[in-house]
Amino acid sequence: MIRRFHIVAIPIRIVVNRFGDHNPNGMIYVLKENESLIKKKVELNPYTPVDLVEPLVIRANVGDEIEILFENKLPFNTSMHIQNAEYDVLTSDGAFVGFNKDTTVKPGESIMYKWKVETEGLHFFSDLGNTLSSELGSNVHGLFGALFVEPRGSWWTDPVTGKPINSGAFADIHNPLLPSFREYGWFFNDEMEVDDLTGQKPINPHTLQPEATHSVNYRAEPMRNRLRLIQEGVVCPDCESEEVHHDSWVFGDPDTPILRAYKGDPIKIR
């Protein structure tokens, strides 16, 4: 089966928690069909996490061929370089290496990548157009995602609505010959550029030094925000012990993803 996706690399503000910590220079892959909606939701919620802003996960079955129309809306060359899939290195590598043709994409242009998948599981992709490891690079700002390859004959649905989906980090996977299971994409992102609500670098209340933010699926719940509210008596003024900052009874669920399932559900975390 041939599966076709139109994917766009876009700049976007990424809000990582309800405290307003955010990356003003975020970059993500999105399906073209969701681009306008995502931009509108982010514009309307500048200091609140938006559910649709997450690492892009697309799916296919073992044996499928995938055609990606990739469009670049960032101000430098970008690409989609996939791991573990089969492809022609001269046309679909998403890189500019040696004497091979440049298969990264200039700003405002597009390219067709063609992949074939024969192995079930995780096929990570990321940008190799801008490989800088600093904040001038793209990967640290969120330009990564994955193709999840399912058993032959599978289909996937939204875990809340039960409707078919074209993308999403979380999904329910069904197969006529195998038990259904819940699937969760879990992406670690080390030291994304994150500012606080005021646009300043976050400060650790213990060390009084700038603090990095480690995120999961573009979300983070750093101790610094909760601890400061407790120290200032804004939250739980009668509570004792700093360990209260870990407690969801006080603060509610964290903004990092919650993996929801019923007792006995088969699950896979990729």
Residue ranges and their predicted role:
Residues 1-104, 184, 196-268:
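N-terminal, post-signal-peptide metal-ligating segments of extracellular/periplasmic oxidoreductases
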Residues 52-54, 65, 110, 129-134, ...:
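Short alpha-helical segments and helix-capping/turn motifs at coil-helix boundaries
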Residues 74-81, 85-89, 94-158:
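Extracellular/periplasmic metallocenter environments
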Residues 120, 140, 179, 262-264:
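Active-site-proximal structural scaffolding
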Residues 9, 147-151, 188:
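Interdomain boundary/hinge segments at the C-termini of tandem beta-sandwich modules
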